[in-house]
């Protein structure tokens, strides 16, 4: 029964459930991770013009590495749930990525598909291109909302960074 209580990550039962889910996800992405339409195109285009890219995810590193590989291994930095830097919307995951990229937040643009991820990036002053025009997002001059990844171009990312 649902209690409304937040599970503790220190609880062995919570860890067991998380590991079971991670195992199922890993099995499903092993052969060919399902990529959102436009993901490979945009990561390839950014790589071709020499822009550093990072993935920031709460997923285990082994899963993130498989997705990164499917996207062409163009990512300089992977920040994963295994890094112990907290979870979105905490700003620390994106702060860690910016630090590892040796950049400043104002020099970065984040593409996010979740409101908690957008909040994490915005907590560092990073501009965000948010996927999902049908969702509700607070008015924020640092947030651009597009319907899907296919709508993103390198020019949009440069404009969003302004």
For each feature predicted by the language model, list its residue ranges:
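Asp-based, Mg2+/Mn2+-dependent phosphohydrolase catalytic module
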Residues: 44-47, 51, 60-162
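Residue-level marker of alpha-helix boundaries and capping positions
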Residues: 33, 55, 107-109
């Amino acid at each position: 029964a649902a209690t409304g209580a937040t599970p503790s990550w220190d609880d062995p039962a919570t860890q067991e459930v998380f590991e079971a889910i991670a195992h199922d996800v890993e099995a499903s992405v092993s052969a060919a991770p399902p990529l959102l339409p436009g993901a490979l195109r945009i990561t390839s285009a950014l790589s071709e013009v020499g822009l550093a890219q990072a993935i920031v995810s709460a997923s285990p590193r082994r899963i993130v590495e498989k997705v990164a590989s499917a996207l062409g291994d163009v990512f300089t930095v992977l920040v994963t749930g295994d890094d112990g830097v907290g979870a979105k919307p905490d700003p620390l995951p994106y702060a860690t990525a910016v630090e590892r990229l040796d950049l400043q937040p104002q020099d970065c643009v984040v593409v996010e598909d979740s409101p908690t991820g957008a909040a994490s990036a915005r907590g560092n002053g990073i501009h965000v291109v948010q996927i999902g025009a049908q969702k509700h997002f607070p008015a924020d001059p640092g947030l651009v909302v597009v319907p899907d990844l296919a709508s993103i171009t390198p020019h949009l990312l440069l404009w969003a960074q302004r």
